[in-house]
C-alpha cells in the first residue's frame, strides 16, 4: 500500500499542472529500457542480487512514475554483456559502474552522464598473488595464468591489461566476481588475479605485486541521445526529489554530475585497450598494443 501511494503521489503531482508540464520520456521503442548493472564492479553473485526483487520493483515503480513511460528493467551482472548492450544502443538509460561509465563515453556521443552513483572507497586496480608465490614483480608474470573480471570492468580488466603490456601469458581466465577470482587463486587455478584494493583480502595469505596509480572514479547514471533530445530534466529532477525511494546501494547522488575530468584519462586507457587483440578464456595471450608514451600512469613494463 505504501509503494502504491508513493507512485500515485508522483503521478498526480506530475499531472496537476496542466498541458505545459512534463511529457512522457520514452525511448524509440515506446518504452524505457533500463540497464541495471549497479555502481560496483565484481561484487555480485548473480543477476538477481544486483538488487533484491522488492528493490527492483520499487525502482521500476519510481522510474515509471517519473518518466510517465512503461519501464523494462534489465539487471545484468556480466560487464561484457552490459558492454555489448551499450554498444548496440539497447538501453535508453543505465545505472553503471566505473568501467562501463568509461565505455559509455566511448560510444560516439550516444550517452551522457547525468548523475553520480556509488560511494568513495579509495579503489585501486591491483595484481595479487598468493603469499607463498615466487612471483615478485609484474615482469615475473610472463608465462603465468591470469584471472580477470570480464571485459567492461575497469579495475578487473582494462587497467590490469594496460599494466601488463608486453607480457605473454600462458592462459587467461574469467570470473564474474572478485570473490570467485580469489577462490581461483587460492585453489591454484590462477597464478595471479586482478583485484580491487578497496576490498578486504585474506590477510597474510596474499601479496600485492602491483598497484595502479589511477584513482578510480565513481559510477554514473547514463542517458541515451534519444532521451537527451527530449525534455529529460523533469525526469532527473523527480529522481532527485525522491532519492529516498531509490535503493541505497546505488549510491545515487542528488544534483551531482560525474567527474568528467577524472574519467577522461581512464576513458583513454579503455579506448587504447579496446583497440588491442583481447584475450580469449582459457587461451594463451600476448598482451598486445602500444600505449601512448604521453599517457600518464603505469603502462608498459
Show the residue positions of the predicted features.
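A ligand-binding cleft/hinge motif common to bilobed small-molecule-binding domains
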Residues: 95-108, 183-216
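Extracytoplasmic small-molecule ligand-binding "clamshell" domains
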Residues: 22-102
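Acidic, polar ligand-binding/catalytic clefts
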Residues: 76-77, 81-140
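Bilobed "Venus flytrap"/periplasmic-binding protein-like clamshell domains
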Residues: 31-65, 122-183, 187, 263-264
Amino acid at each position: 500500500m505504501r509503494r502504491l501511494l508513493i507512485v500515485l503521489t508522483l503521478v498526480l503531482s506530475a499531472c496537476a499542472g496542466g498541458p505545459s508540464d512534463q511529457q512522457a520520456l520514452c525511448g524509440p521503442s515506446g518504452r524505457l529500457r533500463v540497464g541495471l548493472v549497479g555502481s560496483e564492479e565484481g561484487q555480485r553473485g548473480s543477476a538477481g542480487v544486483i538488487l533484491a526483487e522488492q528493490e527492483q520493483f520499487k525502482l521500476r515503480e519510481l522510474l515509471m512514475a517519473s518518466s510517465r513511460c512503461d519501464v523494462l528493467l534489465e539487471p545484468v551482472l556480466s560487464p561484457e554483456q552490459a558492454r555489448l548492450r551499450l554498444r548496440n544502443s539497447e538501453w535508453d538509460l543505465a545505472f553503471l559502474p566505473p568501467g562501463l561509465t568509461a565505455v559509455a563515453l566511448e560510444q560516439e556521443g550516444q550517452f551522457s552522464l547525468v548523475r553520480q552513483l556509488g560511494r568513495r572507497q579509495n579503489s585501486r586496480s591491483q595484481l595479487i598473488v598468493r603469499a607463498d608465490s615466487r612471483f615478485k614483480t609484474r615482469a615475473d608474470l610472463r608465462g603465468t595464468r591470469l584471472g580477470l573480471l570480464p571485459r567492461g570492468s575497469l579495475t578487473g580488466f582494462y587497467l590490469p591489461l594496460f599494466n601488463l603490456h608486453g607480457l605473454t601469458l600462458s592462459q587467461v581466465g574469467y570470473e564474474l566476481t572478485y570473490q570467485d577470482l580469489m577462490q581461483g587463486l587460492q585453489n591454484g587455478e590462477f597464478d595471479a588475479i586482478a583485484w580491487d584494493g578497496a576490498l578486504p583480502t585474506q590477510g597474510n595469505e596474499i601479496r600485492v605485486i602491483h598497484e595502479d596509480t589511477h584513482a578510480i572514479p565513481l559510477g554514473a547514471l547514463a542517458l541515451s541521445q534519444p532521451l537527451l533530445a527530449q525534455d529529460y530534466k523533469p525526469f532527473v529532477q523527480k529522481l532527485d526529489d525522491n532519492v529516498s525511494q531509490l535503493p541505497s546501494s546505488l549510491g545515487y547522488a542528488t544534483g551531482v554530475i560525474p567527474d568528467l575530468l577524472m574519467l577522461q584519462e581512464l576513458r583513454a586507457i579503455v579506448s587504447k585497450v579496446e583497440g588491442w587483440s583481447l584475450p580469449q578464456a582459457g587461451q594463451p595471450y600476448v598482451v598486445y598494443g602500444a600505449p601512448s608514451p604521453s599517457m600518464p600512469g603505469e603502462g608498459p613494463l
